[in-house]
């Protein structure tokens, strides 16, 4: 992200598709980039520990080309570029900005709260797994204690599971239909809510981070990865003011 923030550091687009590797084990990505490195002189920089901030970006030679392997999921990478990033993430399509749901959330008389339930691909990932129900139950209770008149907007890629399994008595609305190329609309809607309960997902992470409410309450899971060893630096994923359960 910090490389994107400065034009002179921008990484050239890689002319190959990685779509076929989606939902595969992480080691497949590793092998793939290792093979490419054998045939190219570009340096491969690997994130050794997920989410741990690496200071190497201040030392790289911007005249050279690099391949970065990892999630680089740490807000410390773009400190000082927050406004630039928010501008880049702001949709320019008025039909999206002024959509019925967006207008409803912005003008709501309630304290709007987004909740993201990420399942689907997480069920077979092996690297990341769905957050347990207790997390959401406890997070909702915290919101009720901190926020008056909350109204919850539910975002999920498994609405049937939510309706059948999450027996929670809260005022809510299920948001569906924004998939594939329109999935970004859900991030926009999350960001327009006053508060956020996120999953262990960069999708809802960005929705909460882009939320510009200065008094927002954001609740995130402590456990981010399926393997406990990978959670060693998971605390660095979220800003310090967010609540981790």
For each feature predicted by the language model, list its residue ranges:
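Surface-exposed beta-strand edges and their flanking turn/coil or helix-capping segments
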Residues: 81, 128-130, 167, 211-213, ...
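Donor-binding and catalytic core of enzymes assembling or modifying cell-surface/extracellular glycoconjugates
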Residues: 142-229
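Short aromatic-enriched loop/helix-cap "lid" or pocket-rim segments at secondary-structure transitions
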Residues: 7-13, 166, 230-233
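Secretory-pathway luminal glycosyltransferase catalytic domains
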Residues: 2-147
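Short, low-complexity, polar/charged sequence segments that are solvent-exposed and flexible
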Residues: 20, 87-89, 132-137, 171-175, ...
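Leloir-type glycosyltransferase catalytic cores
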Residues: 226-245
């Amino acid at each position: 992200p910090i490389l994107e923030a400065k034009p002179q550091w921008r990484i050239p687009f890689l002319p190959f598709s990685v779509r076929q590797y989606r939902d595969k084990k992480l080691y497949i990505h590793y092998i793939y980039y290792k093979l490419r490195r054998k045939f190219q002189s570009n340096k491969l920089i690997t994130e050794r520990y997920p989410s741990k901030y690496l200071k190497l970006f201040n030392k790289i030679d911007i005249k050279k080309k690099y391949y970065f392997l990892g999630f680089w999921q740490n807000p410390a990478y773009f400190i000082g570029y927050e406004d630039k990033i928010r501008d880049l993430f702001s949709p320019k399509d008025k039909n999206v900005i002024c959509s019925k749901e967006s207008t409803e959330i912005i003008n709501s008389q309630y304290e709007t709260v987004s909740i993201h339930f990420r399942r689907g691909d997480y069920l077979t990932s092996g690297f990341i797994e769905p957050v347990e129900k207790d997390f959401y139950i406890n997070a909702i209770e915290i919101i009720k204690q901190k926020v008056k008149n909350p109204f919850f907007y539910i975002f999920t890629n498994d609405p049937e599971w939510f309706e059948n399994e999450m027996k929670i008595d809260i005022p809510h609305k299920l948001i569906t239909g924004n998939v594939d190329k329109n999935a970004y609309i859900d991030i926009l809607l999350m960001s327009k809510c006053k508060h956020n309960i996120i999953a262990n997902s960069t999708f809802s992470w960005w929705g909460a981070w882009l939320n510009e409410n200065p008094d927002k309450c954001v609740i995130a899971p402590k456990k981010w990865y399926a393997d406990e060893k990978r959670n060693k630096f998971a605390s660095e994923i979220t800003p310090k003011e967010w609540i981790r359960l």
